[in-house]
Amino acid sequence: GFTHYHADHISGLPGLLLSMGNAERTEPLTMIGPKGLERVVGALRMIAPELPFEIRYIEIMEPEADIEINGYHIHAFRVNHNITCYGYTVEIRRAGRFSVEHAKEREIPQKYWNRLQKGEEIETEDGAHYTPDMVLGAARKGIKVTYCTDTRPTESLVASAKNSDLLICEGMYAEKEKIAKAKQYKHMTFYEAAEVAKKAEVAEMWLTHFSPSLVHAEDYMPQVREIFPNAFLGKDGKSVEPVSYTHLRAHETPEHL
């Protein structure tokens, strides 16, 4: 998903597409972004015109949008930058537990239980209609990751990131005295990002999108952690296994996880 169309966020696309092609990818690639996505990608593809896979476009026109792709629920939300910009929440939702009692109460034949547990709706030859909610309990906690960059703090960000396992958040400026610059160019300081994480009650936050002038970013983290203790600097190759993941069974995770 593209957050917005400033050069530092889109110029690497042609190389990525070519790498996918060289890796013999053939399945379609879905791209999500603000209005103008297909036009922007088309221009960038001048140097990557021949690809062995189809590109599909989802352009976001409204302040918020909800998209389902391959078992992932994606929520796009408008943020506050100097051009149209979105943040994204990606969730792997987890269905409730299968209830034998519910299935028996509704006299659902046992041969359909497994299919219903997997989320399938069933229409029988004799006209009976069975849905997963007839045999499943309340939804359980899945995995939720929120990503935003190039924005001032917004209520939409706090609301969308609520209870995320991980918030990947811009922190353009570490120096507190650069707050005026952050407001002018529609970015955040480390400390504003920490306040967002605190209000959203996320489990963990990674700061990213640092100013090129920033050196020794780690020196500022003790002050950041006074606001939100579980804050870290993002870096290439960094990974984490959310606590929620340990409670997901393999068959409950989407394809290509």
Task: Please state what every model-predicted region is.
Residues 1-5, 146-149, 168-170, 205-208, ...:
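Active-site neighborhood of phospho(di)ester-bond hydrolases with catalytic His/Asp-centered motifs
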